Amino acid sequence: MYFRTGFCLFYFFQWRCSVISDKTRINEKIRGKEFRIISFDGEQLGIMTAEQALNLASSQGYDLVEIAPSATPPVCKIMDYSKYKYEQTRKLKEAKKNQKQVVIKEIKVTARIDSHDLETKLNQVTKFLEKENKVKVTLVLFGREKMHANLGVTTLDEIAEKFSETAEVEKKYADKQKHLILSPKKVK
């Protein structure tokens, strides 16, 4: 049991520490005979052999990093690899932070819902739509109501008609479950 816990912790820390993949080749790990070299400042130094490029990078105190391995000849840049890796992880974290998660809120409605209860549910739907969340309005039918599903469908149609201006309405009337999905309209 102890070995397994340590084993899992090792992989957890390894996963946590390596945000970007280490597929970027540096220094001696770069394959090829000739490379197109870009200096630390961004100037093109031309095509050099692997040995010349490594000597130039080490004399300046930087690493030789392969940027475009599929180009002919491969493009390498002289730079500080640890700084490059840090910037890449920071860009990935910012991209994840700026992504918006799609949240779907669900409200259940019965076929025999009272008008005041329906108003309360619709107020909830408007609040969810203002927060730019999708809303799923599900029709719940009990017992013999399933035989008269058209009564519940009219309730869903009323809801769809009310929110047709403020939200995009997607109706799904399957055999057993009937629901609408309301997504907020994009403001241009």
From Swiss-Prot:
TM helices/strands, residue ranges: none
GO cellular component, one term: cytosol
InterPro entries for the chain: T_IF-3_C_sf, T_IF-3_N_sf, Translation_initiation_fac3_CS, Translation_initiation_fac_3, Translation_initiation_fac_3_C, Translation_initiation_fac_3_N
MF terms (GO), sorted A to Z: ribosome binding; translation initiation factor activity
Record's keyword terms, sorted: Cytoplasm, Initiation factor, Protein biosynthesis
Gene Ontology terms describing biological process: ribosome disassembly
Pfam family membership, one: IF3_N
Localization per Swiss-Prot or TrEMBL: Cytoplasm
Record function comment: IF-3 binds to the 30S ribosomal subunit and shifts the equilibrium between 70S ribosomes and their 50S and 30S subunits in favor of the free subunits, thus enhancing the availability of 30S subunits on which protein synthesis initiation begins.
Family: Belongs to the IF-3 family.
Subunit structure: Monomer.
PANTHER family: TRANSLATION INITIATION FACTOR IF-3 (PTHR10938), TRANSLATION INITIATION FACTOR IF-3, MITOCHONDRIAL (PTHR10938:SF0)
Name used for this protein in its record: Translation initiation factor IF-3
